[in-house]
Amino acid sequence: MSLDLTTLFTKKVTVVGDVMLDSYWTGPSNRISPEAPVPVVRVTGNEDRAGGAANVAINIAKLGAPCNLVGIVGEDKNAATLEGLVRAHEINPNFVITNTHPTITKLRILSRNQQLLRLDFEDNFADVDTKGIIEAFESSLNDSKVVIFSDYGKGSLASVQQMIQICRQKGIYSLVD
């Protein structure tokens, strides 16, 4: 099978992998905390962005390809925020929801264009039942010609070999981010 890259983004693409929410809190820092030798940031702004595989899907959509997104999220507010971010780019999210893990979230605190701290809210999804992700993956393949696997080592692609085999059986191109 050969893939004509000039027409790649006219075909439906399914992105599957580790989806996450990137949050940025920003503000000035003009003093050191009296409690510990750390800067105090007066938060004046915040922004949420799609991260990981969700960012890959947004980039694909911006190139003009219709796009599905498959990943695992928690049963929480951050999952709803992430879903809204990808839907804003006309991406069809097919998230597997688990109530045992939070949505992977990276919270960065910035001041004066400098990252001061990053807080990671995550558990590895490798122990989540893979049946759900396989079912979500297969149901997202309708009309897809290309699958992009986006692995950040968070466990969403624990069954990647099975997913690649499904792509081979269906004649779908597989790419790795």
Per-region residue spans from a language model:
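Ribokinase/PfkB-type carbohydrate-kinase core domain
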Residues: 1-30, 45-177
